[in-house]
């Protein structure tokens, strides 16, 4: 019996793990990566590239290494709890090398289309059209498709929502374009939004004004006794968050995070409670 062929679109973090999972299940993975290397989001580029994720030079991972690593491949012991993005990229390279995944990846190959075959209702098969760097197009049939192309490739810039933006004489840019603070030296800068990237950039840029519509709960990467925050995500705590009344849970969590600094004194007190809303907290090195 021939192994079922599975297409994996993207050679980043998710793509690599999908290749590994396919091999574990006796499937035949074929990965298509449009760039010339693995890593996806975690590959730093001096200049942002269209249709690709982008990050800034100083970015540090907000998840501790014990929680960030794959269950079958621990992080190197000398890695810090919260690592620089370059260290995580190196970890992905070590992972790909250890499990011999690179031979399943077709680099500089773009997926043009993915369609169900005419007999999909009987076979469950997909028709995938790709184009390599030489412009050669190829159509292949697969029994399954993993889409691992990422979700941060297109910056969202709702500038039309800000009255007067058309007459603003300064420069407007998205965090997708931001690499380091040097172009903003000596300038007055407003950072709109207090997500993780907004918080990081506000710290880096000199003389910054941070603008946030609703405020945010600021969560430190380090919790009690200096342990990584995500080590508090135990089964017991998870159970408590499910069974405790929402008002009591919010009171306890907000009291805990206000011990680091008083959100109201710093003008960051959110208009929403900590739990039970769509807006997530902001992780920072406080």
Regions from the PLM with identified roles:
Residues 3-61, 74-227, 235-286:
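Flavin (primarily FAD) cofactor-binding/catalytic cores of flavoenzymes
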Residues 232:
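Active-site-lining helix/loop region of Rossmann-like oxidoreductase modules
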Residues 66-75:
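Surface-exposed beta-strand-to-loop junctions
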């Amino acid at each position: 019996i021939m192994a079922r062929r599975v297409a994996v679109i993207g050679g980043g973090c998710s793509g690599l793990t999908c290749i590994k999972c396919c091999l574990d299940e006796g499937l035949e993975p074929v990965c298509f990566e449009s760039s010339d290397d693995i890593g996806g989001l975690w590959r730093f580029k001096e200049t942002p590239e269209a249709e690709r994720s982008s990050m800034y030079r100083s970015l540090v991972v907000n998840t501790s290494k014990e929680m960030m690593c794959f269950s079958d491949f621990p992080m190197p012991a000398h890695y810090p709890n919260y690592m620089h993005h370059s260290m995580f990229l190196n970890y992905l390279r070590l992972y790909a090398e250890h499990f011999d995944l690179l031979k399943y990846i077709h680099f500089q190959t773009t997926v043009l289309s993915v369609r169900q075959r005419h007999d999909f209702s009987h076979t469950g098969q997909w028709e995938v059209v790709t184009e390599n760097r030489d412009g050669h197009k190829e159509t292949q049939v697969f029994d399954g498709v993993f889409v691992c192309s990422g979700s941060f490739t297109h910056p969202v810039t709702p500038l039309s929502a800000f009255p007067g933006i058309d007459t603003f004489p300064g420069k407007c840019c998205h965090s997708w374009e931001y690499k380091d603070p040097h172009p903003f030296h000596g300038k007055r800068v407003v950072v709109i939004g207090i997500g993780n990237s907004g918080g990081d950039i506000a710290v880096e840029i000199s003389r910054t004004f941070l603008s946030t519509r609703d405020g945010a709960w600021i969560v430190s990467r380090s919790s009690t006794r200096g342990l990584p925050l995500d080590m508090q995500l135990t089964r017991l705590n998870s159970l408590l968050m499910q069974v405790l009344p929402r008002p009591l849970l919010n009171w306890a969590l907000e009291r805990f995070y206000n011990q680091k600094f008083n959100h109201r004194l710093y003008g960051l007190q959110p208009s929403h409670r900590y739990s039970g809303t769509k807006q997530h907290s902001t992780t920072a090195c406080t």
